[in-house]
A protein has these predicted regions:
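Exported/periplasmic ABC-transporter solute-binding proteins
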Residues: 25-65, 69-71, 76, 80-84, ...
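Bacterial N-terminal signal peptides that target proteins for export
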Residues: 2-13
Length: 261
């Protein structure tokens, strides 16, 4: 269990208790879900959320005594796991379109769907790399031979990278240089380990990684609106709603902002 924070989180605890009261009032039948003050919550989350959700989880655990277990991966792969019956309580995707897909299949609690953040992408290279760039068009230069992006077929940040390269008019020239990561964290690791010179990754990971990075203009790709929802099969709806509420609370928003959201 992550260590308990001080009483400065009392307002959050009050919020959680209020949500518990609302849930109890809605359903007079005997409750089978775990209350937000105890138990365990399993959250599937896109890889770009790793650092920020780990901090959110620590804060939430300390305030509620609900242990949060995270499963991080590419949004597409996590979506397929949910479709195949993975026992997640809440899913935070890197693009709300995947939440819409699950809603169409009747796999989420409809009123729990929400957009919680908008993502950005960056060019990232290691500090010791001799590569220098000012913008995405520089990736077409011959001295840059290997570029990593997340697989656009199942990773929203990879799709945004592909769209940006196409909009910049360099897709055809850089496509032979591309190395695809299964998710955005693996994509960053390719650049960190020197397997590629440059990676296109999320702003969140760039901020929290020791390297040089440049923002890619938002107008080069479709918005990365990140959505979440509670799974219809959850046995812990009360805690899942409390965690979702914490993400959008003033405290949660401050943490999200610190990580580039």
């Amino acid at each position: 269990m992550i260590s308990r924070l001080e009483t400065r989180l009392a307002p959050l605890a009050a919020l959680v208790l209020a949500l518990a009261c609302v849930t109890a009032c809605k359903d007079k039948s005997p409750a089978t879900t775990t209350t937000p003050s105890h138990g365990e919550l399993t959250v599937a989350a896109a890889s770009d959320l790793t650092p920020v959700f780990e901090e959110l989880g620590r804060e939430f655990e300390s305030a509620t005594q609900t242990k949060v277990v995270f499963v991080f991966g590419s949004t597409g792969m996590l979506t397929r796991q949910i479709e195949n019956g993975a026992p997640f309580d809440l899913f935070a995707a890197a693009n709300v379109s995947y939440i819409d897909q699950l809603e169409q299949k009747g796999l989420i609690i409809p009123d729990s769907k929400a957009v919680y953040a908008r993502g950005r992408i960056t060019l990232w290279t290691a500090n010791e790399s001799p590569v220098r760039f000012q913008g995405i068009a520089d990736l077409a230069r011959p001295e840059i031979q290997r570029i990593a992006i997340a697989n656009p077929d199942h990773a929203p940040y990879g799709l945004a990278a592909k769209q940006a390269l196409q909009s910049a008019g360099v897709w055809d020239r850089v496509q032979p240089k591309l190395v695809y990561g299964d998710n955005i964290r693996q994509t960053l690791q390719y650049a960190q380990t020197g397997n590629v010179e440059v990676a296109i990754v999320s702003l969140t990971l760039s901020i929290n990684s020791n390297g040089r990075w440049t923002l890619i203009p938002e107008e080069l790709h479709q918005p990365i609106d990140q959505g979440l929802a509670i799974m219809k099969t959850t046995g812990n709806e009360q805690a899942a709603r409390a965690f979702a509420a914490f993400i959008s609370s003033p405290k949660g928003k401050a943490i999200m902002k610190k990580y580039g959201f």
